[in-house]
Amino acid sequence: LKMHEVRVEVRRMGGAFGGKESQGNALAIACAIAAKATKKTCKMRYDRDDDIIITGKRHDFRIDYDVGFNEDGKILGIKFKHYVRCGWSQDLSLPVADRAMLHSDNAYNLEDVSITSHRLKTNTQSNTAFRGFGGPQGIIGIERAIDHIASHLNLDPIEVRTINFYRSSNILSEGFKYVFCN
């Protein structure tokens, strides 16, 4: 079958962000195999329930951490381990997992930080780009750590957040001076 002999018609792609780059591949492969075997046009469309089950969504993460802090709640060091459920294929899992790592500081000056990311191949649908593209997952890790620090020290979580915020004098891990702080 030559490429010019293939015609794909799509009723609608949907809106928003993510899932349109590679999530249709399973359908396309199934149609190609059926068309080649029968030498006839093939049409396939998931119903909504199957679409939800088969196509990937946001990557779910497990984030483990060890954190050191002083009596004021100032974080002295933190070690994150991200476990990312990618599903049966890589899809966009690598950049999603990378972005989660890059957002692990959120708005906080973490002077001594280690982040490892384990991208897990599982027998579930292949997860893909989704709103936030890994950012929300990375942010949740540090926010949860701060909540635990506040609870352990019996402090208001807002106080712990405030003491750890970036300041204009901070130098980021990339070597840039943080200048957009109040």
Which residues are covered by each model-predicted region?
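Structural alpha/beta core scaffold segments of enzyme domains
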Residues: 1-182
